[in-house]
Curated annotation (Swiss-Prot):
Its EC number is 1.3.7.7. GO terms for molecular function: 4 iron, 4 sulfur cluster binding; ATP binding; metal ion binding; oxidoreductase activity, acting on iron-sulfur proteins as donors; oxidoreductase activity, acting on the CH-CH group of donors, iron-sulfur protein as acceptor. It is found in: Plastid, Chloroplast. This is Light-independent protochlorophyllide reductase subunit B. InterPro entries: ChlB/BchB/BchZ, LI-POR_suB-like_C, Nase/OxRdtase_comp1, P-CP_red_C, Protochl_reductB, Protochlorophyllide_Rdtase. It comes from Chlorella vulgaris. The gene is chlB. GO terms for cellular component: chloroplast.
């Protein structure tokens, strides 16, 4: 546990609550002190939904600490069972309330005797895993619970659907453009002649989980949530799964090919002409292939970019920038430290360096050092970009309200390629735009940022040196500032004056 004013992935209980509140008619009870119960406010603020967040906080206060939690927790479970009539009540502690080391499983067993609902305790180690790992584990736990329950109650043989069908696992609340991606995935599968069997957890019902094994395969669009459930279904029911994220033209094609291979292995009469479909979608429906050959996109060739986000989105955007748009990715990184090996393997050869960290100050210093033409990251990278005057396109959670758009903006599938192309192109400062603004927009009043974003900088700029720096055109100012600071460090100077600026200029032969 550490104190931070910014976290990329939240504590474990947030992941459990995100999964629980994505299902229909599932209620979550959070055993937590005041201060840990911000999930309701966060979800109500960000998600474009009319429903109340189905989460109740069972507050740990001084009375609970004096008498124990059993009475209060059981009372909250039975009360919500009578008030809401949910199909499932899931109890989760937080990392703070876990310190009490209470036997919550015993509380759940006791409450389950008097409840019509199913009651389970989230099986998550709150000290070892983060929000995304906990969400993945909770989804797998709920699916396992209901499938084992159905198996114990019925011995009927499993029957697959007549037509090719798929489950989509991992679409859930507060995800990055998850609702839009889900619509695009439905369209893609429908085009391939594949029926949607179940979508979990978003909008799904736990009473239908026993229908999951009827599908021919599972589609996992995001690595962060759904892989554990897919592996469980593969091991127990021999269900294949596709974990290629269909983001960008090449990976969408790879995803379609994997789906077709799975369907053909089960049904030899399936003769969908996917080659023609891919060709038509790539050439006429998606504008990305045409755009990447246009003069507008060619102007971006060789420009430097930095990518940072969750493993799925950061890896996919890195490959799109490098393979499909010819943009140089100076650094690609992720905050999913638990998936570092997979991430390195995916971006190998597509970027100059890789950064695996959940410390935003390291990301900020890396961006300040590289000075890219554009950043593609999370809400935090947007803030960093504003401080450094570098444009940023948001490509990954965590994000704020402006990245929960009302309009249709998927990142997956062929429509997603159009959205990504727009985002990439609009994120770069175009041509002479910056210079023309200085010429026709009066004096350049932008403050020159002279420090790195961490607190360990050892250089200061004299006022006259800053004034001279502001006279330099914007498109070379950053390079000159960087060279001057490098020269000052070599000469062990803590204050950069005009004399040092001119000496640095002579030293680099300018």
């Amino acid at each position: 546990m550490k104190l931070a004013y910014w976290m990329y992935a939240g504590p474990a209980h947030i992941g459990t609550l995100r999964v629980a509140s994505s299902f229909k008619n599932v209620h979550a009870i959070m055993h937590a002190p005041l201060g840990d119960d911000y999930f309701n406010v966060m979800r109500s603020m960000l998600e474009r939904e009319r429903d109340f967040t189905p989460v109740t906080a069972s507050i740990v206060d001084r009375h609970v600490l004096a008498r124990g939690s059993q009475e209060k927790v059981i009372e909250n479970i039975t009360r919500k069972d009578k008030e809401e009539n949910p199909d499932l009540i899931i109890l989760t502690p937080t990392c703070t309330s876990s310190i009490l080391q209470e036997d919550l499983q015993n509380f759940v067993n006791r409450a389950g005797l008097d409840s019509k609902s199913d009651v389970i305790l989230a099986d998550v180690n709150h000290y070892r895993v983060n929000e995304l790992q906990a969400a993945d584990r909770t989804l797998e736990q709920i699916i396992r619970f209901y499938l084992e329950k159905a198996r114990s109650q019925s011995n009927e043989p499993l029957r697959k659907t007549e037509k090719p069908s798929a489950n989509i696992l991992g679409i859930f609340t507060l995800g990055f453009h998850n609702q839009h991606d889900c619509r695009e995935l439905k369209r893609l599968l429908t085009d391939l002649g594949i029926v949607i069997n179940q979508i979990l957890p978003e909008g799904g019902s736990v009473t239908n989980i026993n229908e999951l094994p009827k599908a021919w395969f599972n589609l996992i669009p995001y690595r962060e949530v759904g892989l554990m459930a897919a592996n469980y279904l593969k091991n127990e029911y021999d269900m294949p799964y596709v974990a290629v994220t269909p983001m960008g033209l090449l990976d969408t094609e790879n995803c379609i090919r994997e789906i077709v291979d799975i369907v053909k292995s089960s049904d030899t009469s399936y003769n969908f002409d996917f080659e023609t479909y891919i060709d038509t979608q790539t050439r006429f429906i998606s504008q990305a292939a045409w755009f990447s050959r246009s003069i507008d996109c060619q102007n971006l060739t060789g420009k430097k970019a930095v990518v940072f986000g969750d493993a799925t989105h950061a890896a996919s955007i890195t490959k799109i920038l490098a393979r499909e748009m010819g943009i140089r990715v100076s650094c690609s990184g992720t905050y999913c430290k638990h998936d570092a090996d997979w991430f390195r393997e995916q971006v190998d050869g597509f970027c100059d360096e890789v950064l695996i960290t959940d410390d935003h100050t390291q990301v900020a210093d890396m961006i300040a050092r590289i000075e890219p033409a554009a950043i593609f990251g999370t809400q935090m990278e947007r803030h960093i970009g504003k401080r450094l005057d570098i444009p940023c396109g948001v490509i990954s959670a965590p994000v704020h309200i402006q990245n929960f758009p009302l309009g249709f903006r998927p990142f997956l599938g062929y429509e997603g390629t159009n959205q990504i192309s727009d985002l990439v192109y609009n994120s770069f400062t175009l041509g002479m735009e910056d210079h023309l603004l200085e010429i026709f927009g009066g004096h350049d009043t932008k403050e020159v940022i002279t420090k790195s974003l961490s607190t360990d900088s050892d250089l200061a700029w004299a006022p006259e040196a800053l004034t001279e720096l502001q006279r330099i055109p914007g498109f070379v100012r950053g390079k000159i500032k960087r060279n001057t600071e490098k020269f000052a460090r070599e000469k062990n100077c803590n204050l950069i004056t005009l004399e040092i600026m001119f000496a640095a200029k002579e030293a680099v032969g300018a």
